[in-house]
Structure formats: structure tokens, C-alpha cells
UniProtKB/Swiss-Prot annotation:
Keywords: Acyltransferase, Transferase. Residues 4-163 form the N-acetyltransferase domain. SUPFAM superfamilies: Acyl-CoA N-acyltransferases (Nat). This is S-alkylcysteine N-acetyltransferase. The gene is snaA. It comes from the Bacteria. InterPro entries: Acyl_CoA_acyltransferase (IPR016181), GNAT_dom (IPR000182). Its EC number is 2.3.1.80. Involved in a cysteine salvage pathway from S-alkylcysteine. Catalyzes the first step in this pathway, i.e. the amine acetylation of an S-alkylcysteine with a preference for S-benzyl-L-cysteine over S-methyl-L-cysteine. This pathway is likely important in the catabolism of alkylated cysteine generated by proteolysis of alkylated glutathione formed in the detoxification of a wide range of electrophiles. It catalyses: an S-substituted L-cysteine + acetyl-CoA = an N-acetyl-L-cysteine-S-conjugate + CoA + H(+); S-benzyl-L-cysteine + acetyl-CoA = N-acetyl-S-benzyl-L-cysteine + CoA + H(+); S-methyl-L-cysteine + acetyl-CoA = N-acetyl-S-methyl-L-cysteine + CoA + H(+). The keyword rRNA-binding does not apply. Belongs to the acetyltransferase family. Pathway: Amino-acid metabolism.
Length: 178
């Protein structure tokens, strides 16, 4: 029987996390999508762990999925005033087994909504080169609040409301790069 553990990544996890991210983002690289996660190296992974909240799903001592939360106060130009998630990746051999969904649900409900009382969260993805990912987020309750066409792709910013009575749509804003 497998025991799943949710925890913050540490710098000691950097090497294993790099392998996970590189493996999971290989198909994205083949689509010519240039996200930081698609060109990650050990320094980038270490900095991501040190500067943000990189959460991992560990099963039987192995890191199988990860997602990072960036908070608005970590940057002078945050994507919005709500937490932003990125570097969401699951080892390919666990694809279709619900590991990524389990981790994302944990981050949305336990970490952001229940512990941090965040009214919403945001993320960015490709709507043209990687449309099935945007569709997956829509099925999970995310909505597009910003889109921009650039370099043959459509980048979209999406949000999910976690605490409706505390959500303020004006805090979404347009990303600084727009």
C-alpha cells in the first residue's frame, strides 16, 4: 500500500525535482512553448525551492508530482494580487492515475483556501499550443481573465475562486508583462 505525503520541497530535493520537471515538461518543449519550467536547470530548481513554496507529492519515498505557489509579495510586479501557481508537473509514469489532480486539489483546498484563506488563485497557460491543459483547468473551475496573442500562441491567465464571499475581481488585474 502506498503512502502519499504532501510537503514543502527542500534544497535537498533539487536534483530529484529537476528530473521530475524535465521529464514531465518534455512534451511541452516539443511544442516550442518557452516557459521557465521547460528550460529548468539545477540552479533554477534550487532558486524556485528557496524563493517560493514548492509543494511535492511523495509516494513511497519518491517525488511524483510538484506545484509551486508564488505569492504577490514575492515580486514588485506579480501576475495578480492572488497567489499564482506554476511548475505543475507529474512524472509521466503516473499520468492518468490522479496524482497531479490530488496534489492540485490539496494545494487549492488545504493550503490556499483552508490554511491561508486565499479567496482565489491564478495560473498561466497556453491556449493555442497546449489547449488541452486550459480545458483541464476549465473543468476544475478555472476561468480565463486575460489573454494575449504573441509569437503564434495565445497565453491565458486563469483564476479559480476559492472563497466566493471574499473574492474581489479587481485584484486580478492585468499581468505586468501585458
Amino acid at each position: 500500500m502506498s503512502d502519499d505525503i504532501f510537503r514543502l520541497a527542500t534544497v535537498e530535493d533539487a536534483s530529484e525535482l529537476l528530473k521530475l520537471v524535465n521529464s514531465a515538461f518534455q512534451p511541452i518543449r516539443q511544442l516550442d512553448i518557452d516557459w521557465p519550467s521547460t528550460r529548468a536547470d539545477i540552479q533554477m530548481v534550487s532558486e524556485n525551492i528557496e524563493h517560493h513554496s514548492a509543494i511535492v507529492l511523495e509516494r513511497d519515498g519518491k517525488l511524483i508530482s510538484t506545484i509551486t505557489i508564488r505569492f504577490p509579495w514575492e515580486s514588485e510586479t506579480p501576475p495578480s494580487k492572488y497567489p499564482f501557481v506554476w511548475w505543475f508537473a507529474t512524472l509521466p509514469e503516473y499520468k492518468g492515475q490522479g496524482a497531479g489532480s490530488k496534489l492540485l486539489t490539496y494545494v487549492e483546498e488545504k493550503v490556499l483556501r483552508d490554511m491561508l484563506k486565499a479567496p482565489a488563485l491564478t495560473l498561466g497557460t497556453s491556449a493555442r499550443k497546449h489547449p488541452w491543459l486550459a480545458d483541464m483547468y476549465r473543468r476544475r473551475g478555472y476561468e480565463v481573465y486575460f489573454e494575449q496573442e504573441k509569437d503564434g500562441d495565445i497565453g491565458v491567465m486563469m483564476h479559480k475562486v476559492l472563497i466566493p464571499e471574499r473574492f474581489n475581481p479587481t485584484l486580478l488585474g492585468a499581468p505586468s508583462w501585458a
